[in-house]
Amino acid sequence: MISNRRSAFALSAAIATLCFAAPATAAKFDGNWNMVLVTTNGHCGVIKMGMAVNGGHISATSGKFAMHKLALAGLISGSGATKINGVAGPRQAVGTGRFTRVKGSGKWTGTGPSGVCAGVWTALRTSTI
C-alpha cells in the first residue's frame, strides 16, 4: 500500500514538473535586457527601457515615456521570433522582431495623442536568470 502511494506521488510530481516547466527553447532568452526604440517616422524620439524575459515571457523592468511608466507584454518563441505590446499612459505600440541569445532587433509602430509613430528597436542582453 505504501509502495503504491509513493509511486502515485512520484508520478504526480513528474507530471507536474513536465506540465509547469518552461520550454527549454524559450528559456534560452531568459534574463535582463536593455532595449532602445528609435523613431524613424513621427515625433516619439528615442525611448530607453529595461526588460526581463522569463520562460519566454517579456515584461518591462524600467523606463518612462512622456512621464508615464512603460509596460510591456510579449512572448519570444523558441526560434527567437517575437511580438511585443507596449503601453505608456494613453500611448500604445506593437513591435515585432527576432532575438538571439545576446541581442534582438525589430520594428515597431505606435499611436497616441500626438499621432502615429514608427521605428526600429534593438535589445542587448545584460544578464541571465
Regions found by a protein language model. Give the residues of each.
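Central antiparallel beta-sheet cores of small beta-barrel/beta-sandwich binding domains
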Residues: 27-129
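Bacterial N-terminal signal peptides that target proteins for export
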Residues: 2-11
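Sec/Tat signal peptide C-region and signal peptidase I cleavage site
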Residues: 20-26
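General helical secondary-structure elements
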Residues: 1-2, 24, 121
